[in-house]
Amino acid sequence: MDSPSGPRVLSSLTQDPSFTTSPALQGIWNGTQNVSVRAQLLSVSPTTSAHQAAAWVPFPTVDVPDHAHYTLGTVILLVGLTGMLGNLTVIYTFCRNRGLRTPANMFIINLAVSDFLMSVTQAPVFFASSLYKKWLFGETGCEFYAFCGAVFGITSMITLTAIAMDRYLVITRPLATIGRGSKRRTALVLLGVWLYALAWSLPPFFGWSAYVPEGLLTSCSWDYMTFTPQVRAYTMLLFCFVFFLPLLIIIFCYIFIFRAIRETGRACEGCGESPLRQRRQWQRLQSEWKMAKVALIVILLFVLSWAPYSTVALVAFAGYSHILTPYMSSVPAVIAKASAIHNPIIYAITHPKYRVAIAQHLPCLGVLLGVSGQRSHPSLSYRSTHRSTLSSQSSDLSWISGRKRQESLGSESEVGWTDTETTAAWGAAQQASGQSFCSQNLEDGELKASSSPQVQRSKTPKVPGPSTCRPMKGQGARPSSLRGDQKGRLAVCTGLSECPHPHTSQFPLAFLEDDVTLRHL
């Protein structure tokens, strides 16, 4: 219980014109109910200047056992090392392998960058302060530490949301994404993600809330303990637009992704096919459910990592900060920072092309993952080429991918699509074009080599002009531009004899790169 004279002494301190309490000292007072800590703050004479007060008790300690500091310090060190090594491996592998540098994978690289910076700026500082059982880096260091944790944490959350929205559009609305998958557009989205994170991380520097010590006073965060309208308003808006709204968007996107996959699976089940065809469709559905499970794990880990920290802040927001102990503030902060080690495992190590790239560029890690780059490369190339051949021959929407296929891990990696996404997007495109998913004859034995398209390279794709080709009916696609000076609607020839231009009929312009075109033999 606090000393009865505590409020009167604190009032005398704040009323003295020579004493100006800093946000850090206010945060210490508001963030702890420990008698010894508040006694250190109240022991300052009313006539002491602000500079002398800061030098006397800049960051007092919490009366907890030493092993509590050492345990948290060890955990945060292990989390930081794992996050740094894991995310650095992701960044290195994606940068070394050209086939992985696709617009879709740029989101994963951005996620790895933000998580890497989170681990670098948080773990060493937290660990050092835990060893000495007090904050070592002063008020400026406290503000910088908390700012880095905020901006990199928010960036990771919003990047996860951008990934979910990107997969949602690609799978459920493939025609709407025509012409929108460029690296430049993705870079603009990522720039918006970082600006959004900065917009919510900078206000404490300008008086809207503050960055103060928290928990065991060996780390810092924004002030969520002070029960004032200004601080409560910032806390409420921060959680609404940084935690709850992104979480709702992620859940919404993956619900519709699951529904698209399920509808595609039902369309396959309704077809009277041979046992070989049914077995392949069943394997495809198993792959789809595997992706669904990975998405579910992403959402659960996202919630589990940040829910404890959010709960603590919301308890203080509701006015019950007096029931919070130092442990209840520090432990959730460590759990939230541990989210930096989840994303490399989920989004990268489970990515088949990434696993092969690790085996190629980091053979030692490839052995640990049980992947051989030399053995996996041909099979992936064959599978990707095989699927491109099937789709370009049998459908009015040919999912064309990639540049320099011999140098990449396969056409699939160029676009950044998984088998599941291709299948679900295929089904959605068939429904949009008014055709049955089952009407496409995709059996290997039913495809003749003489009818397969031949890949030819050209600097600028040749696309049929509106004067000689009819627009494709039922698609409604209006791509604004195409590389090369080609613009216009999605078009298709009614017959090769009616169009003098050599080109592949019936393809979405969005998936045609600047150096690869398909031409008829």
UniProtKB/Swiss-Prot annotation:
Disulfide bond among keywords: yes
Reported tissue expression: Expressed in the retinal pigment epithelium and ganglion cell layer (at protein level). Also expressed in amacrine cell layers of the retina. Weakly expressed in vibrissae, and tail.
Gene3D superfamilies xref list: Rhodopsin 7-helix transmembrane proteins
Domain of life according to the entry: Eukaryota
Extracellular side: 1-71, 128-143, 209-237, 315-329
Cysteines joined through disulfide linkages: C142-C220
Residues found modified as N6-(retinylidene)lysine: K337
One of the Pfam families matching this protein, by short name: 7tm_1
Family annotation (InterPro entries): GPCR_opsins, GPCR_Rhodpsn, GPCR_Rhodpsn_7TM, Opsin, Retinal_BS
GO annotations of cellular component type: axon; dendrite; membrane; perikaryon; plasma membrane; sperm head plasma membrane
SMART domains: 7TM_GPCR_Srsx
Broad class of where this protein is predominantly found: membrane
Gene Ontology biological process terms from the UniProt entry: detection of temperature stimulus involved in thermoception; entrainment of circadian clock by photoperiod; G protein-coupled opsin signaling pathway; hyaloid vascular plexus regression; optokinetic behavior; phototransduction; positive regulation of circadian sleep/wake cycle, sleep; regulation of circadian rhythm
Function: Photoreceptor that binds cis-retinaldehydes. Contributes to pupillar reflex, photoentrainment and other non-image forming responses to light. May be involved in the optokinetic visual tracking response. May be involved in the regulation of retinal hyaloid vessel growth and regression.
UniProt record similarity statement: Belongs to the G-protein coupled receptor 1 family. Opsin subfamily.
Protein name: Melanopsin
